[in-house]
From Swiss-Prot:
Misc. remarks from the entry: Few gyrases are as efficient as E.coli at forming negative supercoils. Not all organisms have 2 type II topoisomerases; in organisms with a single type II topoisomerase this enzyme also has to decatenate newly replicated chromosomes.
Function as written in the Swiss-Prot or TrEMBL entry: A type II topoisomerase that negatively supercoils closed circular double-stranded (ds) DNA in an ATP-dependent manner to modulate DNA topology and maintain chromosomes in an underwound state. Negative supercoiling favors strand separation, and DNA replication, transcription, recombination and repair, all of which involve strand separation. Also able to catalyze the interconversion of other topological isomers of dsDNA rings, including catenanes and knotted rings. Type II topoisomerases break and join 2 DNA strands simultaneously in an ATP-dependent manner.
Enzyme class, spelled out: isomerase
Record's subcellular location: Cytoplasm
GO biological process, one term: DNA topological change
The organism of origin for this protein: Streptococcus pyogenes serotype M6 (strain ATCC BAA-946 / MGAS10394)
Protein name as catalogued: DNA gyrase subunit A
Cytoplasm listed as a keyword: yes
HAMAP family in alphabetical order: GyrA
PROSITE patterns, sorted: TOPO_IIA (PS52040)
């Protein structure tokens, strides 16, 4: 026989229905605030319970356990811990912009410390919390039964200030969450008043009085576009940054001092994170981290090494730690019983509607009360005007019921009026008492007329709302804590995290690249042996050396005619003797593709200029720099090469420069680049020099008549020759002799133009570097051997060289051969 207590249901339907019921219960009754008073049910019940318990600001604190127990027993049967945690949060200055609970005892800290147990702490309502409940006993809001029908609780509080804006809200429901930031009380009230005075105002106009959130912990909001988007749509994101200062100690060291943290950031966790970053070498230059916070305020100190840059470290801290965070707006609240994403204007409109209803209901309550009292006084005045007759009726009546009936019949009184006459004491029969009653009656009639006028005129209701909010503003408002920064600083560029310094970039023949400090090498006299400076093996050698800054962009041109780009700081830093990192780990090179030329391409120096390409077979091409603004990660084609040809080097030119090209067999040709039109990236180019048999191009440079041509041969010989010895001719010729090539000095390793003041760094295939001043190299004619500038071992050859400014000049003025580029001495 079937059990009548069992009901067959479809599991899918039951799961769907039950989950929806549960979700709506969590959404409406637990997790989301009401747009009218800005409170979740638990907070509303705590404040109402404290008010009913008499734990007001003018009374002593009461044990937290008593408060949570009372709230749990009467209104919120969900466990004392959730109630206590909600009450604790309302008592924390770093959580609420205006605390609603005045806590006494340990209520936690912004370091993440929890509050003491509720049996140890005490609490009472704060003064401003009373403004949320003011007039609640005047029928201003609806009440509902509690969970078991034994008590009545308010559906919403009167909320005489816009609490949802002032204290914000956070909460996670089922399938949705809310995150509304706190705001300044004065600004929030001004925004409400602005909407009442100018109903057609825009979000931009509202932001003139409420420019953005005002977090209790202060800090900085970086940029305002995110605020406008959030206020306009209810969703958006802003960047919060700690307020910091860079102090200089008496010893000359710098330290970073944090005085304000972003909202919701745990100071202790930030401390631990910074220490961990320093220990893991992810953030260098920090010597100590101390929390010197006290009752006077927050002070978080980060000590910096003497040689480190506090600004760079601070930028790294902003990127790597919670000293800079994002706050995401999701202004979700309950409107008319339904969860809804609300704009700033919608929040204010809902609050104004609520306040209008509160004022109307309060006015009706006061009017009804005044009318009831006036009705009684009217009866008393009638009795006093007919005192002897009233006394006679009362004396001649056998019972009070008969007396009441006779009075009602004789003077046309109501039951309440006649009862009031019977209850009147004899002392009120004096003439003085009659005057008091008359005065009170007249005042009540005036009050009733005024209250009726309020109900009849909506503009008076608006005026009352504004006046009462102004009074709250006068009593409780305080200055803004969060500073709104003008301009968008929403993200840190990588350059902000890297200290700008002058460095050397070296690239070996086998493709190992590294970055090292430029002052690693000292200048030596001509003929010095040099220092071992590149950490290469016997079968490898340095092929390229570029002097640059860590913030500069480097363009890598390959033998395949492609170009890649890297920031100098993206190249790993190694010690002087370290091997470096294979370039293929940084650039997506194809099989057989090698870097031929590296050019420093600072924007301010490349604007309006061209790249001048020279190939191994003497082909040249000119292309505007702007064609290379957007270089993909896998590179970009710089020029089209003929079969068997390779790119040798690239120059940065103005479009009117003279160019000189040198060949391996010691010949050179000079011509003006204007004879070559600008071509696209996919073009092949035109003939620049007609090569002799078995010859190839080894270098190209810009040239002016007031310069000198510096050539260096493979066996360590070099010389300077006046540029006037090299006449300008048309491109495509075989050229003239630029050096007397013999077995003693060897073939030409490279050719550049110099002013005579530069230092030169010469590199051999053994990785030996020598630095000397160009002035130490003799001036001779074109067809000469030159002088010995570097002592070489028997099997050593010079492979390349580069120019740098002398050591006694400012390092900021270092010129990394932006006018010259030297090809690699590679037999291919």
């Amino acid at each position: 026989m079937q059990d009548r207590n069992l009901i067959d249901v479809n599991l899918t339907s039951e799961m769907k229905t039950s989950f929806i019921d549960y979700a709506m219960s969590v959404i409406v009754a637990r997790a989301l605030p009401d747009v009218r008073d800005g409170l979740k049910p638990v907070h509303r019940r705590i404040l109402y319970g404290m008010n009913e318990l008499g734990v007001t600001p003018d009374k002593p604190h009461k044990k937290s356990a008593r408060i949570t127990g009372d709230v749990m027993g009467k209104y919120h049967p969900h466990g004392d811990s959730s109630i206590y945690e909600a009450m604790v949060r309302m008592a924390q200055w770093w959580s609420y912009r205006h605390m609603l609970v005045d806590g006494h005892g340990n209520f936690g800290s912004m370091d993440g410390d929890g509050a003491a147990a509720q049996r140890y702490t005490e609490a009472r309502m704060s003064k401003i919390a009373l403004e949320l409940l003011r007039d609640i006993n005047k029928n201003t809001v609806n009440f509902q039964d509690n969970y078991d029908g034994s008590e009545r609780e308010p559906v919403v509080l009167p909320a005489r200030f816009p609490n949802l804006l002032v204290n914000g809200a956070t909460g996670i429901a089922v399938g949705m969450a809310t995150n509304i930031p706190p705001h300044n009380l004065a600004e929030s009230i001004d925004a409400v008043k602005m909407v009442m005075e100018h109903p057609d105002c825009t979000t931009r106009e509202l932001m003139e009085v409420i420019p953005g959130p005002d977090f209790p912990t202060g800090a900085l909001v970086m940029g305002r576009s995110g605020i406008h988007r959030a206020y306009d749509t209810g969703k958006g994101s802003i960047v919060l940054r700690s307020r910091t200062e860079i102090e200089t100690t008496q010893t000359g060291r710098e330290r970073i001092v944090v005085t304000e943290f972003p909202y919701g950031v745990n100071k202790t966790k930030v401390h631990e994170h910074i220490v961990r970053l320093a220990q893991e070498k992810r953030l260098e230059g920090i010597t100590a981290v101390r929390d010197e916070s006290s009752r006077e305020g927050v002070r978080f100190v980060i000590e910096i090494r003497r040689e480190a840059s506090a600004t760079v470290i601070l930028n790294n801290l902003f990127k790597l730690t919670s000293l800079q965070t994002n706050f995401s707006f999701n202004m979700l609240a309950i409107e008319n019983g339904v969860p809804k994403i609300l704009s700033l204007r919608q929040i204010i409109d809902n609050y104004i509607s609520h306040q209008k209803e509160v004022i109307i209901r309060r006015t009706r309550f006061d009017k009804d009360k005044a009318e009831a009292r006036a009705h009684i006084l009217e009866g008393l005045l009638i009795a006093l005007d007919h005192l002897d007759e009233v006394i006679a009726i009362i004396r001649n009546s056998e019972t009070d019921v008969i007396a009441q009936t006779e009075l009602m019949s004789r003077f046309d009184l109501s039951e309440r009026q006649s009862q009031a006459i019977l209850d009147m004491r004899l002392r009120r029969l004096t003439g003085l008492e009659r005057d008091k009653i008359q005065s009170e009656y007249d005042d009540l009639l005036a009050l009733i007329a005024d209250l009726s006028d309020i109900l009849a005129k909506p503009e008076r209701i608006i005026t009352i709302i504004k006046e009462e909010m102004d009074e709250i503003k006068r009593k409780y408002a305080n200055p803004r804590r969060t500073e709104l920064m003008v301009g968008e600083v929403l993200s840190l560029e990588d350059e902000d995290l890297i200290e700008e310094e002058d460095v050397l970039i070296t690239l070996s023949n086998k493709g190992y690249i590294k970055r090292l400090a430029q002052d690693e090498f000292r200048a030596q006299k001509r003929g010095g042996r040099g220092v071992q400076g590149t950490g290469v093996n016997n079968d490898d050698f340095v092929r390229e050396l570029v002097s640059t800054s860590t913030h500069d962009t480097l363009l890598f041109f390959t033998n395949f005619g492609r170009v890649y780009r890297l920031k100098a700081y993206e190249i790993p830093e190694y010690g002087r003797t370290a091997k470096g990192l294979p370039i293929v780990n940084l650039l997506k090179l194809e099989d057989g593709e090698t870097i031929q030329t590296i050019i420093n391409a600072r924007k301010e120096e490349t604007a309006g200029k061209s790249f001048f390409f020279t190939t191994k077979q003497g082909i040249v091409k000119r292309t505007e720099v702007s064609e290379f603004n957007n270089i993909r990660q896998n590179g970009l084609r710089a020029l089209k090469l003929k079969e068997g040809d390779q790119l040798i080097n690239v120059l940065l030119t103005s479009g009117q420069d003279d160019i000189i090209i040198g060949t391996h067999s010691g010949y050179s040709v000079r011509f003006n680049e204007a004879s070559i039109r600008n071509m696209g990236r996919s073009a092949t180019g035109v003939r620049g020099v007609k090569l002799r048999e078995d010859d190839r191009v080894v270098g190209a440079s810009r040239i002016r008549d007031n310069q000198e041509v510096l050539v260096i041969t493979e066996n360590g010989f070099g010389k300077r020759t006046s540029a006037t010895d090299y006449p300008t001719k048309g491109r495509g010729g075989k050229g003239i002799k630029t050096a007397n090539i013999t077995p003693k000095n060897g073939q030409l390793a490279g050719l550049v133009t110099v002013d005579g003041t530069e230092d030169i760094m010469v590199i051999t295939n053994k990785g030996v570097i020598i630095r000397t001043n160009v002035a130490n190299i003799s001036q001779t004619g074109r067809a000469t051997l030159g002088v010995k500038i570097m002592k070489l071992d028997a099997d050593a050859k010079i492979v390349t060289f580069t120019l740098v400014q002398p050591e006694d000049s400012s390092i900021a003025e270092i010129n990394t051969d932006r006018e010259n580029s030297i090809s690699k001495n590679k037999d291919n």
